[in-house]
């Protein structure tokens, strides 16, 4: 195994200028990530200088067999923490050969919203809290839980320390460092309320980059859990009963909200979000009704509410924002399996472009 390890960790730059680019895209379910690699003649830092590529869309449920070619458009580059050196990860979106975005390409419409002059002028910032659950591969039962049984009730696990409270920290820390290496703006990690559940935060990131960074961070997490022989689940309620679900709380601010007097603008933005509650819920992730029950730090899926420091509300405003009269707010409705392109762009569209 040592020779295999040595070969995996070969430093290509010592013998060749060529690099490996791992092209990554979202598959037909809207949540499954796919990737494949190609050799390039030398280092690349600008996605516009990367070649387009194609793949068999009939094998990802994105095209029929008789017309299966789907085109990959490179959109964002990150350093590859697995191959290291000058090798890169490339976030792509997907198009037909005629240049039409596929239905699963949520980045295309998000980019249009973020490039709108009224949105771009407000420099929207996002901080996304991505929760996930680590599962034992052979049983699909949370890591650290007894097979067919349950751990002690929730309470000691949130930000917990110790072998009886924190399950999978090696995976979490490996992911944290790999994201920092890659150039993702990951801002922290913590153990969550349900044992075996964790969270990482990305941001503040501007506009479309928030979605690119979340998808890249998810890809890196999937690869690390693959190596560890563990399954990562983004299901919003992986275990029924008296256990917390998994969300992707999305923190948001605009230039106007961050300036003096911004609290009044925040309140107007939240009011607009309330008026479009049903539309947002429909776009905020599959299975969210199992999570948004009014229990376990959520509000009921059919009810919109907001409050200061209230983790049982749809939207939470922090004490500091209220005190300073400016800042940001947190949309607590998105589920852990949400598409970050959809959620971030929809919040911007509703608060900056939509007229009631």
Swiss-Prot record:
- Please name the InterPro entries in this protein's record: Gln_synt_N, Gln_synt_N_sf, Gln_synth/guanido_kin_cat_dom, Gln_synth_cat_dom, Gln_synth_gly_rich_site, Gln_synth_N_conserv_site, Glutamine_Synthetase
Give GO terms for biological process: glutamine biosynthetic process
Keyword list, A-Z: ATP-binding, Cytoplasm, Ligase, Nitrogen fixation, Nucleotide-binding
Q: Which domain of life is it from?
A: Eukaryota
Annotated tissue distribution: Found at highest levels in root nodules.
The SS bond pairs are: none
What's the main place this protein lives? Answer: cytoplasm
The signal peptide stretch is none
Enzyme Commission (EC) number: 6.3.1.2
* Ranges where the GS beta-grasp domain occurs: 19-99
Q: Which reaction does it catalyse?
A: L-glutamate + NH4(+) + ATP = L-glutamine + ADP + phosphate + H(+)
The residue ranges of the GS catalytic domain are 106-356
What is a single Pfam family found in this protein's UniProt entry? Answer: Gln-synt_N
Localization in the cell: Cytoplasm
GO molecular function (one): glutamine synthetase activity
GO CC, alphabetical: cytoplasm
Return the similarity comment. Answer: Belongs to the glutamine synthetase family.
- What does the annotation say about its assembly with partners? Homooctamer.
Name of the protein in its database record: Glutamine synthetase nodule isozyme
- Organism from which the protein derives: Medicago sativa (Alfalfa)
UniProt lineage: Eukaryota, Viridiplantae, Streptophyta, Embryophyta, Tracheophyta
What gene is this protein a product of? GS1
């Amino acid at each position: 195994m040592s020779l295999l390890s040595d070969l995996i960790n070969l430093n290509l730059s010592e013998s060749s200028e060529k690099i490996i680019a791992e092209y990554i895209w979202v598959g037909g379910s809207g949540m499954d990530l796919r990737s494949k690699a190609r050799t390039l003649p030398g280092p690349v830092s600008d996605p516009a200088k990367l070649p387009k590529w194609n793949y068999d869309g009939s094998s990802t449920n994105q095209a029929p067999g008789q017309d299966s070619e789907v085109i990959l458009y490179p959109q964002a580059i990150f350093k590859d923490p697995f191959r290291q050196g000058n090798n890169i990860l490339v976030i792509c979106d997907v198009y037909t050969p005629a240049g039409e975005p596929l239905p699963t390409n949520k980045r295309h419409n998000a980019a249009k919203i973020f490039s709108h002059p009224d949105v771009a002028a407000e420099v929207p910032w996002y901080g996304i809290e991505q929760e996930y659950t680590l599962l034992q591969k052979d049983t699909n039962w949370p890591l650290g839980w007894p097979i067919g049984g349950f751990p002690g009730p929730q309470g000691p696990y949130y930000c917990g320390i110790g072998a009886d409270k924190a399950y999978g920290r090696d995976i979490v820390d490996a992911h944290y460092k790999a994201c920092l290496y890659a150039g993702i703006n990951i801002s922290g990690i913590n153990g969550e309320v349900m044992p075996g559940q964790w969270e990482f935060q990305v941001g503040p990131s501007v506009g479309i980059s928030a979605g690119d960074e979340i998808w890249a961070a998810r890809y890196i997490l999937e690869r690390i859990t693959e190596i560890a022989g563990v399954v990562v689940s983004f299901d919003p309620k992986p275990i029924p009963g008296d256990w917390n679900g998994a969300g992707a709380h999305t923190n948001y601010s605009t230039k106007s909200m961050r300036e003096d007097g911004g609290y009044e603008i925040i309140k107007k933005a939240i009011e607009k979000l309330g008026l479009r509650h049903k539309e947002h819920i429909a776009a905020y992730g599959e299975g969210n009704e199992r999570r948004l029950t009014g229990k376990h730090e959520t509000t009921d899926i059919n009810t919109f509410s907001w409050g200061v420091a209230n983790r049982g509300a749809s939207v939470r405003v922090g004490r500091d924002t209220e005190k300073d009269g400016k800042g940001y707010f947190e949309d607590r409705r998105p589920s852990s399996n949400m598409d970050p392109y959809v959620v971030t762009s929809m919040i911007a569209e509703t608060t900056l472009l939509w007229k009631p």
